[in-house]
Amino acid sequence: MSGSRVRIGIAGLGRMGARHARNLALRCPGAELVAACSPVAAERAWAKDELGVGTTYADYPSLLGHPGLDAVAIVTPTSEHASNIIAALDAGLHVFSEKPTSLLVADCLRVEAAAARRPDRVVLIGYVRRFDASYRDAFAKVRDGAIGTPFMVRSQTIDMNDPSGFFVRFAPTSGGIFCDMSVHDIDAARWFLGGAKAERVFATGTVAIHEGLKACGDLDNGVALCEFEGGKVAMFVASRTAAHGHESMTSVVGTAGRLEIGANPRATRVEIADAHGVRSECTPTYYERFEDAFIAEVNAFVAAVCEGVPLPVTLHDATEATRIAVALQRSIAEHRAVDV
């Protein structure tokens, strides 16, 4: 497709879908957002009025049949990702999908098989940290031997407490805190550890504030350990109850040094010095922290479609992230270490 714009349709216009739609329409020169799909009439109207999307649909099969479509961006509920990806591939389309591929390893493998039948189609699962400038710089340093051989990763995702209860309502279909939040940390750990194969995991946690999570067996704070082949290890921390804001931090330890990404979650380079001391404001949410990476992600997808530019994450990577996250959720449920 070299030299032409990729005609993309987006499925899902909720909180994250609207952000992806805006990026595709306004911040991705190689793409043309030609269609959108949502069962919610107000969301379809927003896509037309705010982004100038010419055609909207209430159902996904109709979107797949849009004339001249090259690709789809899937930002539907996680439980629908795998079937949506496979249907798009069967329709001959390139696919970008939000993470994870699925909450079931078997469905991830079905997606891999469907993609193998269409090697001429690009499929990208949105593990956005692989497109973040700081994470990419850190990976290049690790790859080039700056800290020797990496053997340990500590990675955390911490969100500001949301008293509205949004994620409590979302929790029953999220797969749990490790599938929803820590899956980014899991993918980052495998990336920095050279795609190492996980062998055993253990997870624990608590409900510190949001009692409603107990109804579906979820947590608002969790910690996990993962043992990889060759003696490599990773620790993951997830929290939904921070008072200060969003924090994504990854530490990689090697035989000759250590590096950290995001150790200070400051929103800007401004510091305030007053009677309370010296302080800086924190990044409020994950989107402010990774907004540029989300833009880079969709542009990388378009470059892969148009020019065959290699992508930094594979379907196998996405499957392994799900495999580890699911094992962590099982560890929570069974109160024991679990083989992966």
Q: Which residues does each PLM region occupy?
A:
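N-terminal Rossmann-like dinucleotide-binding module
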Residues: M1-L51, A189
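C-terminal helix-rich "cap/oligomerization" subdomain common to oxidoreductases
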Residues: M1-R5, A71-I74, A300-V340
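Beta-strand-loop-alpha-helix segment that lines the small-molecule cofactor/substrate pocket
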Residues: S2, H66, A71-R130, G145
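Residues forming the Rossmann-fold NAD(P)(H) cofactor-binding site
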Residues: A18-A21, A82, V183
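Short, Asp-centered acidic motifs that coordinate Mg2+ and/or phosphate
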Residues: A35, T55, A71, V122, ...
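Conserved SAM-binding strand-loop segment of SAM-dependent methyltransferases
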Residues: V53-Y60
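Predominantly a Rossmann-like dinucleotide-binding segment in NAD(P)-dependent oxidoreductases
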Residues: R121, R129-C216, H335
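Contiguous beta-strand/loop segments that form the cofactor/metal-binding neighborhood of enzyme cores
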Residues: D187-A267, I295-G308
